């Protein structure tokens, strides 16, 4: 692969020279070449080098290596993270203080950058782990290997887990059968029809008797009230008419005994 140089200018020209930085990234297909920062100024004055290379065995593995060279050290210290083919790792670089402010693109004095590495992205035994850039602080490290677990950063989960797939709800595979038994439906319909026919005949008989009563009772023919020829009105007048007939029969019996000269008992 060709070597590409990318220079990031982090501020206007009137800012202090300490805030300026240059990052040189080399992509190599074979070998283990380490490229240093040519500027030697700004936050990268501590000789922190970054190298991105693909594996030479043809398996299309991508290895991210961070090499830090001290002032009095001859052997650089490297932290390597290898991602196998078909595996997508999530890496977030946080720049800015943890006081509620949003991350900024400019390096500030006294701030430290942190990188988030999931535990599943690291292969045991290859020395994989999180790396911290900018101003190196002791104690902000993670043990290499599978026992190290995950390195969590202080930020919202939406920013850290950008590549996480959303949970999908499985579609319904079984359709509920709401069909009712045909034989039961036919039987219920027959029973309902029979019951309705019996009720209709009973109502017809009652209505016929009420019509006959309305013809016998004389007051029903001249009733012009709100009830009209209602069933309740006809039955009420029928009861009154029966009571009047009883009283008339009693009076007539008394008058007949008086006329015959027999005392009433």
Swiss-Prot record:
Residues 1-21, 119-149 are annotated as: Disordered. Pfam families: HLH. Gene3D superfamilies: Helix-loop-helix DNA-binding domain (4.10.280.10). Enriched in ectodermal tissue. It is found in: Nucleus. Keywords: DNA-binding, Nucleus, Transcription, Transcription regulation. Residues 1-18 have a biased composition (Basic and acidic residues). Signal peptide: none annotated. Residues 134-144 have a biased composition (Polar residues). Residues 190-245 form the bHLH domain. PROSITE patterns: BHLH (PS50888). One of its GO terms (biological process) is regulation of transcription by RNA polymerase II. One of its GO terms (molecular function) is DNA-binding transcription factor activity, RNA polymerase II-specific. The keyword Ion transport does not apply. One of its GO terms (cellular component) is nucleus. May act as a transcription factor which recognizes the CACGTG motif on SPEC gene promoters. PANTHER family: FI24210P1. Efficient DNA binding requires dimerization with another bHLH protein. Binds DNA as a homodimer or a heterodimer. This is Upstream stimulatory factor. It comes from Strongylocentrotus purpuratus (Purple sea urchin). The lineage of its organism: Eukaryota, Metazoa, Echinodermata, Eleutherozoa, Echinozoa.
């Amino acid at each position: 692969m060709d070597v590409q140089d990318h220079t990031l200018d982090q501020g206007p020209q009137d800012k202090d020279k300490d805030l300026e930085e240059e990052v040189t990234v080399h992509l190599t297909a074979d070998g283990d070449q380490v490229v240093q920062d040519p500027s030697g100024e700004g936050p990268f004055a501590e000789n922190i080098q970054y190298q991105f290379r693909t594996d030479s065995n043809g398996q299309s593995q991508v290895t991210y290596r961070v090499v830090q060279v001290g002032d009095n050290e001859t052997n650089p210290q490297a932290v390597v993270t290898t991602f196998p083919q078909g595996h997508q790792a999530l890496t977030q670089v946080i720049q800015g203080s943890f006081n509620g402010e949003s991350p900024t693109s400019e390096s500030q004095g006294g701030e430290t950058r942190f990188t988030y590495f999931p535990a599943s992205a690291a292969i045991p035994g290859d020395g994989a782990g999180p790396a911290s850039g900018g101003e190196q602080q002791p104690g902000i490290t993670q043990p290499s290997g599978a026992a190290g677990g995950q390195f969590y950063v202080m930020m919202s989960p939406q920013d850290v887990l950008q590549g996480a797939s959303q949970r999908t709800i499985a579609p319904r595979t079984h359709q509920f059968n709401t069909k009712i038994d045909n034989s039961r439906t036919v039987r219920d319909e027959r029973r309902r029809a029979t019951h309705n026919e019996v009720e209709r005949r009973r109502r017809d008989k009652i209505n016929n008797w009420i019509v006959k009563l309305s013809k016998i009772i004389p007051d029903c023919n001249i009733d012009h009230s709100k009830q009209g020829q209602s069933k309740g009105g006809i039955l009420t007048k029928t009861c009154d008419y029966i009571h009047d007939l009883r009283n008339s029969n009693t009076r007539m019996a008394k008058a007949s005994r008086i006329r015959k000269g027999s005392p009433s008992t």
